[in-house]
């Protein structure tokens, strides 16, 4: 069968720069494309933004994927609607892209199956952001995206979700619907650097994603001063691409504003504790899964740990206030038996699940 993958982003956008490390761990196009190709399907990929600049598109082509790009194609939606008859199935991603295109695609090719990949529930993430800010405009945006996202789910032949949590949430909202669960796709990593060989604390994120910006501000302004007061002596590493300019103002003797890291596996394998203080979001968190994969224990908010089938105190530590975070970070950083237990159990858990 010939499949058309339609996704937000650019034909040249590397996953390194997308989220600060070498792949968008949960649902990277190459991972999905590779699985589809191994099943014998011919895959074409249409990014929302068409300019070609190299690395990412070439990586897809090495997997046998046809990449549609400029200058041969100037408008992604026009190409899709005009050439849809050449394909047996459409795979659309994200409410902001796939959700917008899906109604026209369904009207033009009503007989063709469409799979809608939420990536995360966008409206849920925006609703949680609105609850944090209390801004009427944020609530209105969340409601607009909710209508688009739920309409796409209703019209799709099947919806792809990342977690049982979001499946249950949607079922409560709209009742039963055709769906499939595809969680994180993580490469195995059996090696684990020991406690003594590691130092410091790190946050990893891509800063085109607003929850990560908010998390860093919360970490630096509210959590880190309390950890300083405990005289832990660790340094905070803020990692990831597309940082706001004012992040440089956070640089201090005990705060290293790193930016983009090419080889995150090596970097995180030298870090003693990973922190995920997300105050809002949805889906499953690649930063949590990737850290645990490397044997780097995590302190996370309930939102950051949500939907990942991880247990507080067994696979990671969960904290929900600045004081809880400071205490959990101090405890995990200094308590070697606890660190070793969570490092081993967390790595084993994600190896089993993802």
Q: At which residue positions do the language-model features occur?
A:
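Conserved catalytic-core segment of nucleotide-activated headgroup transferases in glycan assembly
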Residues: 17-35, 44-45, 154-160, 164, ...
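Acidic donor-binding loop of glycosyltransferase active sites
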Residues: 86-89, 157, 266-283, 294-297
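Short acidic/histidine- and often glycine-rich active-site loop of Leloir-type glycosyltransferases
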Residues: 302-313, 317-318
């Amino acid at each position: 069968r010939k499949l058309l993958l339609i996704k937000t982003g650019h034909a040249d956008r590397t996953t390194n720069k997308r989220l600060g490390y070498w792949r968008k761990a949960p649902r990277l196009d190459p991972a999905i494309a590779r699985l589809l190709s191994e099943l014998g399907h011919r895959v074409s990929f249409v990014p929302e933004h068409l300019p070609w600049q190299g690395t990412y598109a070439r990586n897809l082509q090495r997997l046998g994927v046809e990449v549609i790009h400029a200058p041969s194609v100037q408008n992604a939606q026009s190409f899709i609607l005009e050439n849809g008859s050449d394909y047996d199935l459409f795979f659309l991603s994200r409410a902001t892209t796939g959700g917008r295109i899906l109604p026209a695609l369904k009207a033009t090719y009503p007989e063709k199956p469409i799979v809608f990949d939420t990536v995360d529930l966008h409206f849920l993430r925006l609703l949680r952001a609105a609850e944090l800010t209390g801004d009427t405009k944020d609530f209105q945006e969340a409601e607009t995206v909710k209508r688009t996202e739920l309409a796409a789910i209703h019209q799709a032949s099947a919806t792809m979700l990342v977690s049982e949590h979001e499946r249950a949430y949607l079922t409560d909202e709209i009742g039963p619907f055709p769906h499939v669960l595809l969680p994180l796709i993580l490469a195995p990593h059996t090696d684990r650097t020991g406690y003594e060989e590691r130092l410091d604390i790190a946050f990893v994120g891509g800063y085109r994603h607003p929850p990560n910006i908010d998390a860093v501000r919360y970490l630096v302004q509210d959590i880190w001063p309390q950890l300083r007061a405990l005289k832990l002596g660790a340094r905070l590493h803020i990692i990831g691409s597309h940082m706001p300019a004012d992040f440089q103002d956070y640089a201090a003797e005990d705060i290293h504003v790193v930016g983009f890291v090419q080889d995150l596996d090596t970097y995180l394998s030298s870090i003693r504790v990973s922190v995920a203080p997300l105050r809002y979001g949805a889906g499953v968190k690649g930063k949590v899964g990737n850290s645990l994969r490397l044997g780097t224990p995590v302190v996370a908010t309930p939102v950051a740990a949500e939907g990942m089938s991880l247990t507080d105190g067994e696979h990671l530590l969960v904290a929900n206030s600045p004081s809880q975070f400071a205490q959990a970070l101090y405890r995990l950083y200094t308590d070697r038996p606890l660190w070793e237990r969570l490092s081993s159990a967390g790595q084993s858990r994600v190896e089993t699940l993802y």
